């Protein structure tokens, strides 16, 4: 089941048995009593008599705009500081934010909620949390709200989720439902200063990342200020669920809303990034009318496309309430929205790109490109003279005063410039496609618009330019996102090693030993052997498995399944075998270890040369060569590849120890940061960390050399852009690298001997040969043209009204040029000239197009003059 299905299933159960699932004792003690909303049917808790919950759709919109409901107007970061100060009395520890790119958790691409920082291992109880009660200002990315940004006033694609997390185990209870709701109410009333009777608590169900539980949302004056989840359950791969061993308070609140609520301004964006909004207002020369904006803002909360079925009807209701024409209302709101979109989208992009994501047409990068192109499309639509790079700089100055790491923006502007060129090229192509569609009078349905955007990158704004009457759905971007949200269903696999003890891996403790004795645990098949211990390294982490011999029988493959290592033999093992002597192919292992360590070195070198946006996107190490896929926004130049080679070899020659450290996951993350997850998510409590001190640190299960010098020379072979945002590097080390260099040198020597010139003279000699070849080609072309002229002249000089001849040695362009010189002589005749797989025909007597169609597949032209291509096979 997906998250929505879980919520739908559990809501009736939680509502029916609310005393079991919700913190009823504390809510009652604080003077709140339960009611059921007469409009939406949800349970809620209030200190005052009311018939409706406090959702904007049920309570009549936002009722805090222009009001002062807190003890003071809080600035953005000030609200966070107040929160931390309040919660310190209960022993909560504030943490630094995690990166937005969720490399430690394979189920997610971007962090979408604060709890993702602790999934899956802390939440599952597999590892210890940094502290039992923590707070964090986690920047999150959510792309399902794109349509709401700038409309509802509260939605963002990138926002700070204020976290309150406690981790309760059977051995250690910290705080859970009853304590947690009391702490939040204390912060709201004492920290922010909201009167208790202005706060309404809603019952709900939360699900995300495979976990779920009851939750309490807290509202005031129509605005949700946060959501405290009591995470008790996890979904199992077969679609069921079970109790979590570690029960978690997962409170998430948009920090942007706290500052907004306290300031009472029409939209939250002016409270979140006031300096950036002021910059945008000045550059665009447009500001919303304050009276209109404040009036609209009170209704904005009911226009959430995620919550209402009929968005059009909701807009009509707002227009009616404001006594405005719907078209006029939308024109005014959309122009304001565009300014907020520029601010929101650029901040999201700034943080995501800083954290290692790149705009592309695949994965999470697809969403980033969406944001970027939407910004440019809106700038084009409103013809604003504003440069996105300047908005980025404003965020770096404003938001970077808090998230100081953003001031180190790396290759950001290079990435944006490359994307701008791609956008312009896409825009040119899009205009041609739209023209053809308009000319053909194609019906542009909502599904067709989404398809055009998703497959061709044609924005709705661009379509609107060419076809003003087209109707763009209000939830357009939500529909686009829905295409990319589908997840594969997990299945429980029955494996061949079920019930077998885990194999003792000796290759980590004894990586330089290659011979061993072991006991046979089981022969799974005559050629699949399981031992109690082994020196054979199994396929994993992109490194090929070892080969060698067991009792003289060749081991051709080794792999691991649930901790059990399986040796695949070339021929059957006698079934009564109980003990074996194994011998690993030493030479093969050494080159694999060298290639693996060289991969870490090349990764460092690529990061050094290209920028900190470079992350590993894949790797493979074989005895022949190694490859490393890196994130990068464009193809590499030969000079960049050479510089990577130089930096890599410089590190190799420094003779830096390659140190293996076994560390707890939490300890490794705190000491080395999330950079350790170069190869993606790594399972387990204890991580094996490969340290090249001062240069590269990665969580890695591979076999390595013990010193960088032992990788030998690293020879870069090639770079290739294998997909949008990913470049593949191939290279060799040790003897393989030497052989590669010698191979290249032998080619140079062969050319040198053949041409009778020295190595240094090969380039200019090749250039001379090339120039001579081009000159000969030019002369050959002239001779061809002359020959064609003679052939046509001779054919036309013969009597008769039909000419059908083969013209040899000419291409189509040469033939057509010659035809132009003789057209006057075609009058009153049928003339056909046939070349190599093409033909030209003219006739005043017959339908020459039909005549050519008898012998050719593709014919274009009229009955008097036609061209033909691709000759039909002769019968």
UniProtKB/Swiss-Prot annotation:
Catalyzes the attachment of alanine to tRNA(Ala) in a two-step reaction: alanine is first activated by ATP to form Ala-AMP and then transferred to the acceptor end of tRNA(Ala). Also edits incorrectly charged Ser-tRNA(Ala) and Gly-tRNA(Ala) via its editing domain. One of its GO terms (molecular function) is zinc ion binding. Belongs to the class-II aminoacyl-tRNA synthetase family. Gene3D superfamilies: 2.40.30.130, 3.30.54.20, 6.10.250.550, Bira Bifunctional Protein, Domain 2, Threonyl-trna Synthetase, Chain A, domain 2. Binds 1 zinc ion per subunit. Keywords: Aminoacyl-tRNA synthetase, ATP-binding, Cytoplasm, Ligase, Metal-binding, Nucleotide-binding, Protein biosynthesis, RNA-binding, tRNA-binding, Zinc. The keyword Ligase applies. Consists of three domains; the N-terminal catalytic domain, the editing domain and the C-terminal C-Ala domain. The editing domain removes incorrectly charged amino acids, while the C-Ala domain, along with tRNA(Ala), serves as a bridge to cooperatively bring together the editing and aminoacylation centers thus stimulating deacylation of misacylated tRNAs. Its cofactor is Zn(2+). The gene is alaS. One of its GO terms (cellular component) is cytoplasm. Zn(2+) binds at residues 596, 600, 700, 704. Its main location: cytoplasm. Its EC number is 6.1.1.7. This is Alanine--tRNA ligase. It is an enzyme of class 6 (ligase). One of its GO terms (biological process) is alanyl-tRNA aminoacylation. SUPFAM superfamilies: Class II aaRS and biotin synthetases, Putative anticodon-binding domain of alanyl-tRNA synthetase (AlaRS), ThrRS/AlaRS common domain, Translation proteins.
């Amino acid at each position: 089941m997906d998250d929505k299905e879980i919520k739908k299933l559990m809501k009736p159960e939680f509502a029916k048995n609310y005393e079991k699932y919700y913190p009823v004792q504390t809510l009652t003690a604080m003077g709140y009593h339960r009611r059921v909303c007469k409009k939406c049917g949800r349970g809620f808790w209030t200190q005052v008599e009311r018939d409706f919950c406090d959702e904007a759709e049920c309570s009549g919109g936002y009722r805090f705009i222009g009001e002062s409901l807190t003890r003071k107007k809080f600035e953005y970061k000030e609200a966070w500081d107040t929160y931390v100060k309040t919660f310190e009395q209960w022993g909560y520890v504030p943490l630094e934010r995690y990166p937005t790119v969720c490399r430690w958790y394979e189920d997610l691409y971007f962090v979408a909620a604060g709890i993702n920082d602790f999934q899956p291992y802390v939440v599952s109880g597999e590892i210890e949390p940094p502290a039992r009660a923590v707070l964090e200002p986690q920047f999150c990315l959510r792309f399902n709200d794109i349509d709401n940004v700038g409309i509802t006033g509260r939605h963002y694609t990138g926002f700070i989720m204020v976290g309150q997390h406690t981790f309760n185990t059977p051995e250690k209870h910290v705080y859970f439902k009853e304590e947690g709701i009391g702490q939040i109410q204390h912060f709201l009333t004492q920290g922010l200063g909201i009167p208790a009777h202005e706060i309404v608590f809603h019952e709900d169900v939360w699900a995300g990342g495979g976990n779920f539980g009851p939750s309490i949302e807290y509202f005031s004056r129509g605005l949700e200020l946060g959501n405290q989840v009591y995470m008790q359950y996890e979904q199992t791969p077969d679609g069921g669920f079970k109790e979590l061993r570690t029960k978690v308070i997962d409170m998430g609140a948009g920090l942007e809303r706290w500052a907004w609520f306290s300031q009472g301004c029409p939209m939250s964006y002016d409270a979140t990034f006031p300096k950036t909004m002021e910059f945008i207002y000045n550059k665009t020369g447009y500001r919303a009318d304050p009276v209109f904006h404040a009036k609209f803002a009170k209704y904005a909360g009911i226009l959430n496309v995620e919550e209402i079925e009929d968005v059009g009807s909701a807009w009509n209701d707002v227009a009616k309430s404001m006594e405005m024409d719907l078209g006029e209302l939308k024109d005014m709101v959309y122009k304001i929205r565009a300014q907020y979109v520029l601010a929101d989208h650029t901040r999201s992009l700034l943080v995501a790109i800083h954290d290692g994501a790149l705009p592309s047409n695949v994965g999470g990068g697809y969403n980033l490109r969406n944001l970027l192109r939407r910004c440019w499309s809106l700038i084009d639509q409103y013809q604003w003279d504003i440069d996105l790079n300047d908005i980025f700089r404003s965020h770096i100055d404003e938001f970077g005063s808090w998230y100081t790491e953003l001031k180190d923006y790396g290759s950001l502007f290079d990435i944006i410039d490359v994307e701008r060129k791609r956008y312009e090229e896409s825009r040119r192509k899009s205009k041609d496609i739209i023209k053809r569609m308009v000319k053909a009078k194609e019906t542009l349905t909502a599904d067709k618009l989404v398809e055009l955007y998703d497959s061709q990158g044609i924005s709705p704004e661009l379509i609107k330019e060419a076809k003003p009457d087209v109707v763009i759905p209000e939830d357009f971007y939500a529909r686009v996102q829905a295409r990319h949200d589908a997840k594969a269903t997990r299945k429980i696999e029955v494996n061949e090693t079920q019930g077998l003890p885990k194999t003792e891996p000796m290759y980590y403790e004894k990586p330089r030993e290659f011979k061993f004795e072991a006991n046979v645990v089981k022969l799974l098949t005559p050629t699949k052997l399981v031992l109690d211990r082994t020196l054979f390294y199994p396929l994993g982490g992109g490194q090929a498995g070892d080969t060698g011999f067991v009792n003289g029988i060749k081991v051709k493959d080794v792999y691991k399944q649930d901790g059990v290592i399986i040796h695949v033999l070339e021929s059957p093992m006698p079934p009564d075998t109980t003990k074996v002597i194994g011998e690993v192919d030493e030479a093969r292992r050494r080159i694999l270890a060298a290639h693996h360590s060289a991969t870490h070195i090349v990764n460092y070198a690529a990061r050094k040369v290209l920028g900190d946006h470079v992350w590993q996107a894949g790797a493979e190490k074989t005895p022949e060569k190694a490859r490393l896929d890196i994130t990068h926004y464009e193809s590499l130049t030969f000079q960049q590849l050479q510089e990577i080679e130089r930096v890599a070899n410089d590190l190799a020659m420094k003779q830096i120890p390659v140190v293996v450290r076994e560390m707890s996951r939490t300890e490794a993350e705190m000491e080395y940061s999330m950079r350790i997850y170069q190869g993606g998510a790594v399972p387990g409590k204890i991580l094996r960390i490969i340290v090249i001190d001062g240069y590269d640190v990665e969580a890695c299960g591979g076999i390595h050399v013990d010193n960088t010098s032992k990788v030998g020379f690293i020879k870069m072979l090639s770079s290739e852009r294998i997909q949008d945002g990913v470049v593949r590097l191939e290279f060799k080390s040790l003897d393989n690298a030497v052989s590669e260099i010698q191979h290249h040198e032998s080619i140079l020597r062969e050319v040198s001997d053949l041409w009778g010139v020295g190595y240094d003279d090969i380039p200019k000699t090749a250039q001379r040969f090339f120039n001579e070849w081009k000159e000969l080609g030019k002369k050959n072309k002239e001779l061809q043209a002359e020959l064609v002229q003679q052939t046509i002249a001779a054919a036309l000089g013969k009597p008769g009204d039909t000419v059908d001849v083969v013209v040899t040695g000419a291409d189509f362009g040469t033939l057509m040029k010659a035809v132009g010189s003789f057209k006057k002589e075609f009058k009153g005749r049928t003339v056909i000239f046939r070349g190599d797989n093409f033909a030209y025909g003219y006739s005043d007597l017959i339908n020459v197009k039909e005549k050519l169609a008898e012998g050719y597949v593709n014919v274009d032209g009229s009955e008097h003059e036609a061209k033909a291509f691709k000759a039909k096979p002769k019968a």
